[in-house]
From Swiss-Prot:
Mg(2+) 1 binds at E424, D498. Its main location: cytoplasm. GO terms for biological process: DNA topological change; DNA-templated DNA replication. Few gyrases are as efficient as E.coli at forming negative supercoils. Not all organisms have 2 type II topoisomerases; in organisms with a single type II topoisomerase this enzyme also has to decatenate newly replicated chromosomes. This is DNA gyrase subunit B. Binds two Mg(2+) per subunit. The magnesium ions form salt bridges with both the protein and the DNA. Can also accept other divalent metal cations, such as Mn(2+) or Ca(2+). Its cofactor is Mg(2+); Mn(2+); Ca(2+). The keyword ATP-binding applies. It comes from Buchnera aphidicola subsp. Acyrthosiphon pisum (strain APS). Mg(2+) 2 binds at D498, D500. Its EC number is 5.6.2.2.
Amino acid sequence: MKNIYDSSNIKILRGLDAVRKRPGMYIGDTDDGSGLHHMVFEIVDNSIDEALSGYCKEIIVTIHSDNSVSVKDDGRGIPTDIHPEENISAAEVILTVLHSGGKFDNASYQISGGLHGVGISVVNALSEKLELIIDKNKKKYQQIYRHGKPENPLSIIGTTDTTGTYIRFWPSYKTFTNNIKFQYEILSKRLRELSFLNSNIAIYLEDNRTSIKNCYHYKGGIKAFIKFLNAKKTPIHTHIFYFRSTKDQIELEIAMQWNNSHQENILCFTNNIPQKDGGTHLAGFRSGMTRTLNLHIEREGYNKKNKTTIIGEDVREGLTAIISIKIPDPKFSSQTKDKLVSSEARSVIESLINENLIEYLLENPSDSKFIIQKIINAAKVREAARRAREINKKKSILDLGALPGKLSDCQENDPKFSEIYLVEGDSAGGSAKQGRNRKNQAILPLKGKILNVEKSKFDKMILSQEVASLITALGCGIGKNEYNIDKLRYHYIIIMTDADVDGAHIRTLLLTFFYRQLPELIEKGYVYIAQPPLYKLKKGRKEKYIKNDEEMNTYQIKNALKDLVLKSEDNLIINQKLKKFKKIMSEYHYIQIIMKQSKHYFPKLVFNELIYHNHLHNLKDIEIVKEWIYTLAENLNKKDNSNNHYSIEIKENLDKNIFEPTIKISRYAHYTKYDFKEEFLKSKEYLLITNLGESFKKYFSDKVLIEKSGSTYKIDSIKNTWKWLIKQSKRGLFIQRYKGLGEMNPEQLWNTTMNPETRNMLQVTIKDAVSANNLFNTLMGEAVEPRRQFIENNALKAENIDV
């Protein structure tokens, strides 16, 4: 067979075909969701460019219920006149021709994020359908595209007094085969960033799938961004370092503040586009800052006694910083703009950071002292850790020659097929060791209380026995000098902890450890969370395992509503009402769950009474509100057999000109208030509750009997009927709630949690590093106030607390 390679093998991809053939070159990964969301950002970036030129004040991004996304701005509107070279409208040129746009002409945009002129045409190429509406020159224009091709020329569909551009697109299922669902959190993160970077713009994000709406309009700019990022940390100095300056046509804006953590968080932007891989602006910032602070430390004599060498990582420990540059002709490493390669940016930033940082340090001596002290302490800790590593080199805790004694290793040598289970305690570790597949499953038991790596310094952390065992077992090392991912011994690192409070605590600590110290393991998808069952059900010889409370709820409903017969009082079967009865009972059960998770929390007795209480529609009439809340309190006082007493209050909301009732529950000298805010009284939850009561009264006001498992019950209230059904469904059923993995024997643990054929595992990913960072700080950091607030907001929703 001849292998001919000649001119016939050379393919020319014209128009937008190149984009469809190699979409990853233009928007990034099309499988993991990043490329999908990048489509939205390409359109938003065009609107931001209008804002940078002073023509746009408002951007509205909408996720529609059919999973399309629209972006609307009030800029000048895309040009609609006929292009002199292409003989079609300029709008059509922009949407169908690669490397076209107004950003190559310096008169239209002095500064822009667009470099290659491919953004919006790429979105068009990778969309099943795209709708374009332009408001310009008192006219409203429209054009529809399918798979990048126009259905018809740009046409006038009406008149308007506004200007702007509206683009709505439906992503192509052929391109985005694995992930076609937009995530609100990812879009929210980017739009929030843009609002901080452009304090003169209001950006709205609406999700029609869930009715969530947000407006991002941060007038404090990047200083407000720093406050947002440091909200759950403890800053070590008061005044945020900030400056804005221009040199050689490059505008630089920097804000930064140190906190008491040990990690750096530096975000880089060029013309509002984020660079996750940094680039020349980050390099200039780092070198300029290290040099400037070293000079200041030397001049002021801060380091006379110890003569510790200060390096870049010492300077950046606990630093939160925003670097935002505006540059006329930015150069990036790729269309996704993840790395800036404009060489001129480095020298400009080095120079400007030197001038402004020295000025800040001299003008703020108190802040300067705290910053320098932190830097010197960081250097001392680093040096101490280095010396400890050198002294213990031969028997280093990181040396793979001596694996931890508690590790039961596997036989497999290829990390791609090797699993390590990080198990809580020796008891569970014993069951896991006996139940595992020795060929490729290793077990490492960890003590109940491992070190809080969020609060601990690096040298203290690596000397902790539990962390040391973990690092040794993984084999990849830790820290800049020791870490090597190629030496990782397992590509499946599975956290397997109990379902109780201690288990959740240890799981959080381990996730903190991986997130802070070995983030690449999470980024590469090597970290998993095992999903052992929470319940075991047994009836006769049959056994069933249930994974979580949600699955248990579904099982309970199904079991409670199975094999029912409805009868009238004279024993006639009336099963025509059975379907409605099951619907009411299911809704009651689910409303209880919804209310527990909702921010509108009320005690069970109040919740159950609301079902039968009439719907409160009118909050403007105080007499109606008074009658409603008075009757509710009166009924509660009659039905509550405890020492609780229910009284009422009515608060006037002057802003809205309405009256909002409050129920006050007193018990001896203590009382708790529950407000019925307008937000709740207009919510879906409240409507569901009152509709449920009305349906029950309508269908079951007559005397109806229910029969199940040979027993009969006279229907009186939803609550009592549901309790009876649950009780009947549990007859002969043994329910065991596992508090610990040690309660399972090896065979059960294998069948439910470790067998690749039957197990469920959660892969740990960090979609939004900033939000994850804040969550870890809230739960694990030293600042008490944010944690207290978190506990107060969530305590009432807590279930299954072990006392």
